[in-house]
Amino acid sequence: MDAMAHWAADIPEYAITLARDFWPGPMTLVLKRADLAKDFITGGQETVGLRVPAHPISLALIKEFVAAGGYGIAAPSANRFGAVSPTTAQAVEDELASYLQEEDLILDGGACLVGVESTIIDCTGPTPMVLRLGAITPLMIEESTGLVALESNPSSIRVSGSLDSHYSPKAKVILDVVAVAGDGLIAPDQIPTPNGVIRLAAPSTIEEYARVLYHALRSADQQGLEVVVVLQPGGDGLAAAIRDRLQRSSSK
């Protein structure tokens, strides 16, 4: 909480409650920036996004910086703008190989545990507003804070993944149609694979769907597929976050 106050100002009580309930975890809080959060950190905005990841390697790295007198790490996402997000160290290397310098390091902590990006919550107003859906759902936010979590579309705050077209592979993504020979297919495991269709993923749970989605989309490009058919999951919560990513990936 001390680091929160270092980067952010006018922190509402419900933001502190969310931090206590869901950090470390896949949640980013957007807060009014403090004077120490300079433009090169905030992208020139009057807000700053704060997150405490749950991965033990990430936490260990942050603790090393704090032990040396720091207050955290300022860093962008490890992917090119608009492209499919990497969920493994190999995917990061594939994505950024031409930009990496000899002194650059990639920390390999295995595949991402959730798969889709963190929930982003705007905490600059009287109630929380969800700017990007993720594993921390609006219902979970409401149960934590006692406040109704609104969903913003669009927002005056620029956030990653808010454009209509995003998370897009080179292949064309088509939603909820019948796959034909030569297409790639991402669908729940109970859906059979038609003859000649390349099965990219067959998740059995919504959590597995989120974990394998981006890897499957990247695999389509690696195999040179032109079309990927994806059957969207139904339901609320994490399923809604997956549908959000799929609808953006199919909008190019």
Task: Name each region found by the language model.
Residues 1-252:
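Active-site-adjacent structural elements in enzyme catalytic cores
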